[in-house]
């Protein structure tokens, strides 16, 4: 089955056909590193890491680029408030970002370019736009001449005249048209700066991504992604810059994830209801946070609450319990082959359904439903008196593979298994010695730890409740 992606540009699902067979060029807008990220900032890395993982699962070679904006008005403001320089603050929060998203199961991008390390190509990009008549210098600033780009507004599906009607020129801006936007900002006294043909200054936000995407992925890319809030003006402006320069389509597929609400209220710093990732992963397993985020389709908003998180945790633990019980059953399983094909064939259907969900615009919500169905199917098999090692291992491998696609892992608990086996052996010895009080105490202690014993003709079996 082919993959279909909802393209913000066309507002419809389209069959995914990359520019080069089995290769994907993917650019995801990264953070401005002036503070710790909150859970809203963390949704794009988790969502698009999962997209990348699934594409790789399907055999694509994914070139995944995600940038750091390490010089910006917000960084300059933070530096002034803290009495530190911009590079020091940027470095601190880049390190914090990696700690947070790694905990959340995100792989590093193929490249994590920084604005400050690519200033030469950014300045060259701006100069080329000036040379082509798409940009102009004004008292040390450089602005993009929006009216020169015929397709402006095509991503956000807005007419340029409607956009102009709602725009205005702010005090201190030296642009010709309210819709024009800054490509280069002249440095103010005491600000960090770089030398350029227009004097000392630094780049505007939008030009950075256009320049770095072109440097690392070429004139045209397959997927450009980010949060819904970036579609306008950031991504709209990227299209205007890149397509004006190259004359080629910038990105074939535009993907945007939805917002996060906190207790049914939009999350925002002004309301003070945002949750920092480095705080919440101290309270909850980071894998639970990721599983929760993926339990909703990426384009839909998420309502974040402790109640919903706990409910999701219950579901995740059911899957993990099934996995642990399967691991435990391997030792007591045999090489029998009766009914193997039936169970293996049914198991394969769950993988097919999982992949069908992911093929449909990376619908992780429906994919997770199939993960639950697979776990329930495995639980039915575990009720069999005799189980096959081949089938048990197939369940384990399939659960691990589907978890891996979602960026999740099963926690290894071999040591705990050995502890349980040792206690069971101690209970067997107690029963042989007719010390039934000790045997009952061991059984009850294990039950308190959610370990259920079952005495059978073949010996004592155990499972996690």
Curated annotation (Swiss-Prot):
Gene Ontology biological process terms, A to Z: cysteinyl-tRNA aminoacylation
Binding residue positions for ATP: 269
Cofactor binding notes: Binds 1 zinc ion per subunit.
Enzyme category, top tier: ligase
Keyword Phosphoprotein: yes
A cellular component annotation (GO) from this entry: cytosol
Modified residue annotations for Phosphoserine: 270
Keywords for the protein's UniProt record, in alphabetical order: Aminoacyl-tRNA synthetase, ATP-binding, Cytoplasm, Ligase, Metal-binding, Nucleotide-binding, Phosphoprotein, Protein biosynthesis, Zinc
Residues where Zn(2+) binds: 29, 209, 234, 238
Reactions that this protein is recorded to catalyse: tRNA(Cys) + L-cysteine + ATP = L-cysteinyl-tRNA(Cys) + AMP + diphosphate
Domain of life according to the entry: Bacteria
Gene Ontology molecular function terms on file: ATP binding; cysteine-tRNA ligase activity; zinc ion binding
Family matches, as Pfam families: CysS_C (PF23493), DALR_2 (PF09190), tRNA-synt_1e (PF01406)
Complex and partners: Monomer.
Family recorded in the similarity comment: Belongs to the class-I aminoacyl-tRNA synthetase family.
Protein name: Cysteine--tRNA ligase
Species this chain originates from: Bacillus cytotoxicus (strain DSM 22905 / CIP 110041 / 391-98 / NVH 391-98)
Lineage per the UniProt record: Bacteria, Bacillati, Bacillota, Bacilli, Bacillales
């Amino acid at each position: 089955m082919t993959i279909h992606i909802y393209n913000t540009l066309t507002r419809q699902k389209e069959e995914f056909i990359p520019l080069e067979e089995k290769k994907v060029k993917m650019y995801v807008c990264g953070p401005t590193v002036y503070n710790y990220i909150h859970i809203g900032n963390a949704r794009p890395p988790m969502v698009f890491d999962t997209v990348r993982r699934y594409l790789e699962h399907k055999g694509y070679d994914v070139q995944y680029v995600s940038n750091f904006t390490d010089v910006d008005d917000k960084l300059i403001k933070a530096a002034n408030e803290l009495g530190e320089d911009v590079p020091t603050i940027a470095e601190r929060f880049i390190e914090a970002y990696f700690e947070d998203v790694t905990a959340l199961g995100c792989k590093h991008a193929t490249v994590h370019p920084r604005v400050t390390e690519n200033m030469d190509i950014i300045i060259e990009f701006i100069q080329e736009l000036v040379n082509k008549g798409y940009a102009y210098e004004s008292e040390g600033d450089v602005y993009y001449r929006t009216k020169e780009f015929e397709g402006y507004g095509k991503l956000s599906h807005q007419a340029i005249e409607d956009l102009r009607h709602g725009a205005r020129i702010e005090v201190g801006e030296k642009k010709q048209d309210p819709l024009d936007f800054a490509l280069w900002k002249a440095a103010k006294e005491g600000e960090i700066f770089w030398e350029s043909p227009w004097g000392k200054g630094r780049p505007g936000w939008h030009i950075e991504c256009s320049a770095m995407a072109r440097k690392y992925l070429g004139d045209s890319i397959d997927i450009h992604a980010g949060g819904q809030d970036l579609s306008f003006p950031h991504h709209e402006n990227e299209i205007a810059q890149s397509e004006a320069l190259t004359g080629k389509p910038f990105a074939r597929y535009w993907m945007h994830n939805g917002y996060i609400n906190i207790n049914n209220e939009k999350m925002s710093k002004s309301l003070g209801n945002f949750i920092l990732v480095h705080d919440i992963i101290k309270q909850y397993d980071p894998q639970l946070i990721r599983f929760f985020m993926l339990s909703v389709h990426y384009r839909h908003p998420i309502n974040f609450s402790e109640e919903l998180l706990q409910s999701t945790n219950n579901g995740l633990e059911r899957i993990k319990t099934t996995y642990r019980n399967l691991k435990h059953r391997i030792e007591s399983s045999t090489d029998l082959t009766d009914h193997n094909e039936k169970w293996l064939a049914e198991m394969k259907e769950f993988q097919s359904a999982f992949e069908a969900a992911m093929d449909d615009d990376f619908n992780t919500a429906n994919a997770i439903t199939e993960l639950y169905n697979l776990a329930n199917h495995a639980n039915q098999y575990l009720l069999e008196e005799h189980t096959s090692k081949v089938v048990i291992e197939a369940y384990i491998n399939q659960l691990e593979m589907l978890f891996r696609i979602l960026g999740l892992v099963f926690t290894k608990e071999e040591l705990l298994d050995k502890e349980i086996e040792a206690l069971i052996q101690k209970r067997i010895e107690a029963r042989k010695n007719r010390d039934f009080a000790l045997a009952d105490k061991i059984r009850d202690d294990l039950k308190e730890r959610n370990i259920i014993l079952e005495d059978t003709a073949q010996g004592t079996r155990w499972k996690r409740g």
